[in-house]
Design a protein with these regions (language model features):
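Extended alpha-helical assembly domains of large eukaryotic scaffold proteins
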Residues: 51, 59-325
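Non-catalytic protein-protein interaction scaffold segments in large eukaryotic complex-forming proteins
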Residues: 1-85
């Protein structure tokens, strides 16, 4: 640990001088895991290696975030004043989370393929089996428990990765160093990375976690896609988020309906969320639809003006005639 006063507490010295290198420790551990996997170890050994390495990485990162959250007021560490680069916000650290996530996700698929789909069942069902003391049953229950731990780890990795990328973005905003890196990172995070971290959780029966992450981070496009998912979405969830977030969620939801040609569904919200729908039409270029809303609400002058305005945009006579019908 280098030179230090032998009378000084070793743990205190570590946190004082070496905690900044935790990111390097995680990077080293990641490299070791990659080497072991590439050596061709069997599925049980691979499971043990990945589960244990994930435990260490998550223990370090989640503890760091929880500590900072609990002490942020005391140390004045709010998101608007991040001008320092924490070890979690370093580019070398955040780049580890994507392969960590994919490695863990792949392990779930590999185990299901090699060990059989029964490992994805609830182990409690087998614990009530008369053959509970059977060696094969005990092994299956053990593997089912491992599978559930891996699923939970995947959820935690998604959470910590999103937090770390948010940290990096806030640091770049506060430092005013690299505008190009900030723009590129925000685009990658919002359009590619964050969806790829949250959506797969639905496939492993962790849809509640997916909803919670999207809600917590106000990822309204992802929330919309989850709410309109035939398997996990519901009208109750949609109404909940419309009431909670108003225009922020509503605009993204209504935009999704327009993009996907679900206009009948869109106009179903007129009665309960008419004002929200009107705000959406007023702030978006959807005159071809907004006049229908105006007619439904009795705003005939607005409907007439909108139709005239829309027809003036047409360059051919036939579309004008159709638009004015």
């Amino acid at each position: 640990m280098g030179n230090y006063d032998s009378n000084e507490d070793v743990v205190r010295v570590f946190f004082k001088n070496k905690v900044k290198d935790v990111g390097l420790l995680i990077e080293t551990m990641n490299n070791i895991v990659v080497e072991m996997i590439e050596s061709g170890i069997n599925i049980d050994k691979k499971t043990k290696v990945i589960i244990e390495s994930n435990r260490y990485i998550l223990a370090a990162t989640l503890s760091a975030f929880e500590l900072r959250k609990s002490k942020s007021d005391f140390y004045g560490l709010d998101n608007s004043t991040k001008s320092f680069e924490s070890w979690l916000a370093k580019s070398s650290t955040i780049q580890l989370f994507e392969p960590l996530y994919e490695r863990t996700r792949k392990l779930l698929r590999d185990r299901s393929r090699e060990l059989g789909s029964s490992i994805d069942d609830n182990p409690e069902e087998y614990m009530r089996d008369d053959n509970i003391n059977n060696k094969n049953t005990q092994q299956l229950i053990k593997r089912q428990s491992e599978q559930e731990e891996i699923r939970n780890q995947l959820c935690q990795i998604a959470e910590i990765a999103i937090e770390a990328y948010n940290d990096r973005i806030e640091y770049l905003r506060g430092s005013n160093k690299t505008e190009k890196e900030l723009v590129n990172l925000i685009e990658k995070f919002n359009n590619k990375l964050r969806p790829s971290l949250i959506h797969p959780l639905v496939l492993i029966n962790k849809s509640d976690i997916a909803f919670n992450l999207a809600e917590k981070h106000k990822a309204f496009r992802i929330l919309t896609e989850l709410c309109t998912n035939d398997n996990v979405g519901s009208i109750d969830r949609i109404k909940y988020y419309l009431d909670l977030f108003g225009n922020q969620f509503g605009f993204e939801l209504f935009k999704w309906y327009v993009e996907n040609g679900k206009l009948w569904t869109l106009f179903q919200y007129e009665e309960s969320y008419g004002e929200l729908l009107r705000n959406f039409f007023e702030q978006s270029d959807n005159g071809r639809l907004s006049w229908l809303h105006d007619l439904k609400t009795g705003s005939f002058n607005d409907a007439s003006n909108t139709l005239i305005n829309e027809s003036s945009k047409e360059t051919e006579l036939a579309p004008k005639q159709v638009s004015l019908i």
